[in-house]
């Protein structure tokens, strides 16, 4: 549970300074006479203004606009043959916090913009916190973390004008064909969920599970909404952005207040460890899915959101999700995007919130002890008993590492140090899965809306070169799609 709020309303309460001293006035500064200057020793006025100047922390460089809630996850099935993780053992119920977000928009931007949605879950397990930091899409735009700053820059605002720019977005996308699968997903109905309650969530990356016998498996997570999938059209989303920029945030909070608790069923895809070496698709490529015909969904359990935060800043804005937070039985994979995020996320939290961000109640473990030798640093709150040494190893009985308990996971790799793309597998092209999404998964109405969404976006591109490259990009996804986009853009330009 979170901490007890301060300052409950009760008769006879009085205003104090931050150190508990009563103050003389909420309305008037201390001045030299009624019309004279404010004196510097009015400590309360100085404190009040100085605190106000420092209320904001840096917003997240991505996923700035968001909301969240508490709930629980209950494992209803037996997947112990695949993982020893305590939270995924049959019947175990685990407290959790989830944060939903858009990616590119600022903290005050409309949450109904067309954008992927963050789907980050913090499980407060008995073995420590496990953070599953995913999206509402099973894939992403790039497959190597070194390109992430460039990608995000292309989706943000122009440095000179401060405006978002279609040319910049399509220039990056069309020069990076690995983005085709995700852009097709984004430009379709799935890019505009009607509410956060009506969208699925995905771990997106490939992770490793380890069972009690030490057997290793590769795993992908799928959270299927129990509310059903519902989407906005572009016109509906635009209208809602003007009416209520916080529609998704408001809808989630009010649903929980009504007792209409949203829920998701968790499924996983399991790939035997050895399969990854010869599978026709690189199983660690974040721009690809694993076809369900090869690796079907296996039910794990149920996530329910049943409690709103008491304070948005303390519990949502300061919430810090890190892909590096694993628990025994769950580990990383050779996914180059995941490996980059394992570094970058906790680094961002240290900058944005502070060195000791993990000690904040929302980020600290709720069901497991913390035993380590870190100490000091800005805003340190917790500290070890004076009898505990500050170094390891020691002969004084302090905590010691336990490799068997930790179970960090592993994989084999060798070769020279190189800067190169993944080794290509037989089906590792950039367009075939996007083509399947268009040709097989979507129906006629969905394809029609996809063409409309793409053409509206590409039609706003000013550069002839970039626009033509965007047309070729969609030709590569599917010739029919490319042709329809060209025709729609031309028709809009001619006014027909």
Stretches found by the model and what they are:
Residues 1-496:
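Active-site-adjacent core segments of small-molecule enzymes
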């Amino acid at each position: 549970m979170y901490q007890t709020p301060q300052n409950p309303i009760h008769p006879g309460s009085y205003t104090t300074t931050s150190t508990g001293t009563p103050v003389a006035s909420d309305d008037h500064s201390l001045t030299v006479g009624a019309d004279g200057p404010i004196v510097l020793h009015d400590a309360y006025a100085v404190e009040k203004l100085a605190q106000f100047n420092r209320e904001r922390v840096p917003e997240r460089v991505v996923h700035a606009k968001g909301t969240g809630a508490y709930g629980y996850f209950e494992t209803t099935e037996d997947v112990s043959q695949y993982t020893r993780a305590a939270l995924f053992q049959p019947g175990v119920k685990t407290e959790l916090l989830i944060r939903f977000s858009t990616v590119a928009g600022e903290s005050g931007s409309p949450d109904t913009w067309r954008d992927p949605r963050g789907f980050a879950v913090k499980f407060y397990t008995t073995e420590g916190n496990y953070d599953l930091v995913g999206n509402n899409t099973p894939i992403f735009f790039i497959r190597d973390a070194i390109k992430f700053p460039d990608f995000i820059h292309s989706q943000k605002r122009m440095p000179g004008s401060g405006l978002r720019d279609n040319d910049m977005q399509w220039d990056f996308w069309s020069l990076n064909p690995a983005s085709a699968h995700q852009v097709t997903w984004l430009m379709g109905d799935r890019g505009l969920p009607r509410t956060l309650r009506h969208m699925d969530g995905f771990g997106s990356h490939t992770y490793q599970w380890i069972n009690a016998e030490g057997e290793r498996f590769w795993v992908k997570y799928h959270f299927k909404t129990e509310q059903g999938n519902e989407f906005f059209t572009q016109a509906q989303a635009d209208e809602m952005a003007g009416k209520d920029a916080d529609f998704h945030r408001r809808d989630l909070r009010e649903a929980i207040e009504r007792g209409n608790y949203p829920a998701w069923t968790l499924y996983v895809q399991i790939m035997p460890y050895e399969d990854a070496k010869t599978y026709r698709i690189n199983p660690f490529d974040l721009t690809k899915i694993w076809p369900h015909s090869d690796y079907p969904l296996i039910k794990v359990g149920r996530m329910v959101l049943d409690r709103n935060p008491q304070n948005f800043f303390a519990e949502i804005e300061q919430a810090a999700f890190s892909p590096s937070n694993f628990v025994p039985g769950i580990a990383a994979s050779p996914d180059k995007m995941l490996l980059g995020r394992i570094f970058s996320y906790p680094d961002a939290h240290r900058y944005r919130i502070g060195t000791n961000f993990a000690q904040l109640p929302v980020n600290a473990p709720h069901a497991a002890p913390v035993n380590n030798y870190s100490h000091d640093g800005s805003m340190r709150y917790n500290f070890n008993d004076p009898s505990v040494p500050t170094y390891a190893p020691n002969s004084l009985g302090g905590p010691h590492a336990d490799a068997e308990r930790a179970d960090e996971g592993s994989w084999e790799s060798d070769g020279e140090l190189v800067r190169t793309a993944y080794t290509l597998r037989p089906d590792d092209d950039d367009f075939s899965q996007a083509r399947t999404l268009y040709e097989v998964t979507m129906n006629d109405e969905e394809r029609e809306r996809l063409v409309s969404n793409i053409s509206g976006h590409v039609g706003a591109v000013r550069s002839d070169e970039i626009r033509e490259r965007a047309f070729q990009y969609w030709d590569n996804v599917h010739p029919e799609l490319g042709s329809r986009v060209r025709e729609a853009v031309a028709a809009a330009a001619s006014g027909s």
